[in-house]
């Protein structure tokens, strides 16, 4: 959540930074008007309360000195009535402003270039040269069917479209990749964590998936049958996680972390679940875009002054992991129009897929600054014993299915067989 004080006191700066995202002008105008109304009502209520306090003090003094108090009492009664009217108005406006703030995206920082969509992203550098094949490289779904690694029809039979079944070396390779990724991340200083994959609503509010992206989530409605506190049959909203970013970040929700425990560097493997509501017609073949997929995530909680350096550490970790697998890739700085909701800046890592003859995203490393920490109330106690918001960062290291795709396409032979990267062989 953006800083409401900044929204109210320096709206022009907020609007200028959000302009990088090409938000609709009507939405920003609504935010400006609501912030103005709240600020005016809040100021009026504070002035009335100050006047009430002053006159209450005077009332006590007059009464003690035996002075006439009837007119002063009448003024206090009027102030009391006015405050009883305005304070609920302030509360309503505050709730409306907080609700609006929950759907306002993060402010892009100075690293984020101006641009409307992915075509305006800026390539930073390329790592490893793509292999030149002396035959037409096949796409991963062709190789999967030929080798019996992935069964698409059976995935649909078991669930629906965008589900699949890994078999034989495909299943073993996926398991090997998960173990290798976790070991690699651990070697770079990230603590391995195992978290739930089902979470409550508050957890998703903390990292920003709710309320704006509820349609992208798989929701579970649990009814508690046993009587709890005299309430029977109470419903409880639960969701399947779209990424381990959600659970790793919210581990510290509503907590104050000692400054000497920062930075916290965490990694976890989880299955992830997404409805992909806005992806109809995109990547309908293969396993690039699935409703259920495995991912190994990196999350960091840091002091504000350390977050840029930690973001670079995370970028290097994911890039070096790809390099260790011999997979060509490039780093791309996302423009404002392509930036995720919670990110202040993002570097995408895109892996080369020779079968598709293009680079495809395999990791996004984002610095959210204090956006998520403010929503989730994750703070740390600094050296002066003051509570401050941490910065949170997240990124994949890596998306397992897409890494499997990249290995299949980059390590294929002319006869359709697939070599195994050397670093994975001890895991198989």
Swiss-Prot record:
Q: Return the Gene3D superfamilies for the record.
A: Bira Bifunctional Protein, Domain 2, Serine-tRNA synthetase, tRNA binding domain
From the Swiss-Prot or TrEMBL record, give the protein name: Serine--tRNA ligase
Q: What interactions and quaternary structure are annotated?
A: Homodimer. The tRNA molecule binds across the dimer.
Question: Per the UniProt entry, what species is this protein from, by scientific name?
Answer: Wolinella succinogenes (strain ATCC 29543 / DSM 1740 / CCUG 13145 / JCM 31913 / LMG 7466 / NCTC 11488 / FDC 602W) (Vibrio succinogenes)
Role description: Catalyzes the attachment of serine to tRNA(Ser). Is also able to aminoacylate tRNA(Sec) with serine, to form the misacylated tRNA L-seryl-tRNA(Sec), which will be further converted into selenocysteinyl-tRNA(Sec).
Name one process (GO BP) from the record: seryl-tRNA aminoacylation
Q: Where does L-serine bind?
A: 243-245, 297, 396
Q: Give the PANTHER family listed for this entry.
A: SERINE--TRNA LIGASE, SERYL-TRNA SYNTHETASE
In this chain, ATP is annotated as bound at 274-276, 361-364
What NCBIfam families does the record tag this protein with? serS
- InterPro entries, per the entry: aa-tRNA-synt_IIb, aa-tRNA-synth_II, aa-tRNA-synth_II/BPL/LPL, Ser-tRNA-ligase_type_1, Ser-tRNA-synth_1_N, SerRS_1_N_sf, SerRS_core, tRNA-bd_arm
Q: What is the lineage of its organism?
A: Bacteria, Pseudomonadati, Campylobacterota, Epsilonproteobacteria, Campylobacterales
A cellular component term (GO) from this record? cytoplasm
């Amino acid at each position: 959540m953006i800083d409401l004080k900044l929204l109210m006191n320096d709206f022009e700066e907020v609007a200028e930074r959000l302009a990088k995202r090409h938000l609709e002008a009507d939405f920003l105008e609504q935010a400006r008007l609501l912030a103005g109304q709240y600020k005016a009502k809040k100021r009026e209520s504070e002035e009335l309360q100050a006047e009430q306090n002053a006159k209450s003090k005077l009332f006590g003094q007059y009464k003690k000195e035996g002075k006439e108090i009837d007119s002063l009492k009448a003024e206090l009664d009027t102030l009391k009535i006015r405050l009883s009217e305005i304070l609920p108005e302030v509360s309503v406006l505050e709730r409306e402003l907080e609700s609006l703030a929950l759907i306002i995206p993060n402010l892009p920082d100075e690293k984020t270039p101006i641009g409307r969509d992915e075509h305006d992203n800026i390539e930073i550098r390329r790592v490893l040269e793509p292999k030149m094949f002396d035959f037409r490289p096949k796409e991963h779904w062709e190789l999967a069917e030929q080798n019996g690694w992935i069964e698409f029809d059976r995935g649909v039979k078991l669930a629906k479209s965008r589900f699949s079944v890994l078999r034989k070396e495909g299943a073993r390779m996926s398991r090997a990749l998960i173990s290798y990724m976790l070991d690699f991340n651990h070697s770079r200083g990230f603590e391995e964590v195992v978290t739930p994959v089902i979470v409550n609503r508050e957890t998703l509010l903390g990292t920003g998936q709710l309320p704006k992206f509820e349609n992208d989530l798989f929701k579970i409605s649990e009814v508690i049958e046993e009587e709890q506190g005299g309430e029977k049959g109470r419903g409880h909203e639960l969701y399947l996680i779209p990424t381990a970013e959600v659970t790793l970040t919210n581990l510290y929700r509503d907590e104050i972390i000692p400054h000497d425990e920062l930075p916290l560097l965490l990694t976890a493997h989880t299955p992830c679940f997404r409805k992909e509501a806005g992806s109809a017609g995109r990547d309908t073949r293969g396993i690039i875009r699935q409703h259920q997929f495995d991912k190994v995530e990196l999350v960091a909680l840091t002091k504000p002054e350390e977050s840029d350096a930690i973001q670079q550490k995370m970028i290097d970790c994911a890039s070096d992991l790809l390099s260790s697998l011999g997979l060509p890739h490039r780093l791309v700085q996302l423009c404002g129009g392509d930036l995720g909701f919670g990110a202040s800046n993002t570097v995408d890592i895109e892996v080369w897929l020779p079968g598709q003859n293009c680079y495809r995203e395999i990791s996004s490393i984002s610095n959210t600054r204090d956006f998520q920490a403010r929503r989730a109330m994750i703070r740390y106690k600094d050296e002066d014993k003051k509570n401050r918001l941490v910065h949170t960062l997240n990124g994949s290291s890596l998306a397992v299915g897409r890494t499997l795709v990249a290995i299949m396409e980059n390590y294929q032979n002319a006869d359709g067989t697939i070599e195994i990267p050397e670093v994975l062989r001890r895991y198989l």
